[in-house]
Amino acid sequence: MAERKKRSSIQTNKPNKKPMKKKPFQLNHLPGLSEDLKTMRKLRFVVNDPYATDYSSSEEEERSQRRKRYVCEIDLPFAQAATQAESESSYCQESNNNGVSKTKISACSKKVLRSKASPVVGRSSTTVSKPVGVRQRKWGKWAAEIRHPITKVRTWLGTYETLEQAADAYATKKLEFDALAAATSAASSVLSNESGSMISASGSSIDLDKKLVDSTLDQQAGESKKASFDFDFADLQIPEMGCFIDDSFIPNACELDFLLTEENNNQMLDDYCGIDDLDIIGLECDGPSELPDYDFSDVEIDLGLIGTTIDKYAFVDHIATTTPTPLNIACP
């Protein structure tokens, strides 16, 4: 404990070291500058550190002091003054080097120059430029191939010993394909022109046909209208209706005047007149008729009951009492 107190007392007796402020670089103090270059502008940069915290007195002594705010000032000349200074400095350098100017090369340009100057490792210094459509095999021979301009398919030309032979084969085949492509393009253009002319001619002929058909239809319609309206209805013959009135509408019709004759006049007005007193044509009582002649007075029905014959009207009561359902008997 005593040692710690001694150390703390020693540390408190040490004087506080203040940070040294760097003076900004000023061109005003440089000798040999004109008055235009001495007119400077000041740039001030202020940076705040949000993570800087306040420490106690003991911690400030042990640790490096950390400021929350940094201020930096830079003096810069104006643009015209800067260009003038560069020209003056270049003139001074040329005069010092006996008229030989030194060019400043940037770092990027230096790298580019170095890359161009250094040879590529693993490749021969003498590189051969290969023509189009020619490539070298692994065993040293040269292969040539070309793409067909119409079908867009690769055509194999062959394998050759030298590069010149493969290039000549490619060139000859290319000339042939170029001529073929030109011929096909010319033929297609001619066909397109002919088709366009044919289409235009067919369209014009169709238009003419339509116009002719429309004109003929209009003429026929006009003639039919004139014929229908020019008809003279005065020349139309109307038949007389008297012939239809004189004829009898009902065939085989008989007159009913016989009912109102003088002979039967008193009978119609009699209160005790019967059907027998009327004379109906075609239904005489004494004469023959088309209806069948039946006499039901002597009819006896044998019902098979105990072998005896019953009264001719008693079977109706017997049927009503014995049979639950009616009999379907067809009448003559």
Swiss-Prot record:
Region Disordered, annotated ranges: 1-33
Source taxon at top rank: Eukaryota
Keywords: Activator, DNA-binding, Ethylene signaling pathway, Nucleus, Transcription, Transcription regulation
Any one GO molecular function term: DNA binding
InterPro entries for this protein: AP2/ERF_dom, AP2/ERF_dom_sf, AP2/ERF_ERF_subfamily, DNA-bd_dom_sf
GO cellular-component term (any): nucleus
Basic residues bias (residue ranges): 15-24
Compartmental location: Nucleus
PROSITE patterns attached to this UniProt entry: AP2_ERF
UniProt record similarity statement: Belongs to the AP2/ERF transcription factor family. ERF subfamily.
Protein name: Ethylene-responsive transcription factor ERF119
Taxonomic placement: Eukaryota, Viridiplantae, Streptophyta, Embryophyta, Tracheophyta
Gene name of the record: ERF119
